Amino acid sequence: MIQQETRMKVADNSGAREVLVIKVLGGSGRRYANIGDIVVATVKDATPGGVVKKGQVVKAVVVRTKRGVRRTDGSYIRFDENACVIIRDDKSPRGTRIFGPVARELREKDFMKIVSLAPEVI
């Protein structure tokens, strides 16, 4: 469960390494975000020469969570870390590569570009 003040790893090559969640988008007073949800975050750690800089406010989609998600067939999928991908306003990723696996639930939420760039879809 991703909420305000959660620090997440960035799973793309946009230049950010770690972000801190400012707000979970979608509804008034929404508390938690899960896989496929969009959050507003600030960059806490960045690589030199990247597209995004430290302190910049960005939108990101959650691609991996430690809590995981329940599928319709009753199975659960969970990951070792909380990770996100930084996106533009049109839901396209800012980076050109995605690192690590992503969940299949992103396909249902119309993040097709992220799914196609990911090395593995679980």
Swiss-Prot record:
An MF annotation (GO) of this entry: large ribosomal subunit rRNA binding
PROSITE patterns referenced in this protein's UniProt entry, alphabetically: RIBOSOMAL_L14 (PS00049)
Alphabetical list of SMART domains matching this protein: Ribosomal_L14
Domain of life: Bacteria
Gene Ontology cellular component annotations, sorted alphabetically: cytosolic large ribosomal subunit
Keyword line: Ribonucleoprotein, Ribosomal protein, RNA-binding, rRNA-binding
InterPro entries (UniProt xref): Ribosomal_uL14, Ribosomal_uL14_bac-type, Ribosomal_uL14_CS, Ribosomal_uL14_sf
Family annotation (Pfam families): Ribosomal_L14 (PF00238)
CDD domains registered for this protein in UniProt: Ribosomal_uL14
GO terms classed as biological process: translation
Zinc in keyword set: no
Cystines in this chain: none
Assembly: Part of the 50S ribosomal subunit. Forms a cluster with proteins L3 and L19. In the 70S ribosome, L14 and L19 interact and together make contacts with the 16S rRNA in bridges B5 and B8.
Protein task: Binds to 23S rRNA. Forms part of two intersubunit bridges in the 70S ribosome.
Family membership: Belongs to the universal ribosomal protein uL14 family.
Protein name: Large ribosomal subunit protein uL14
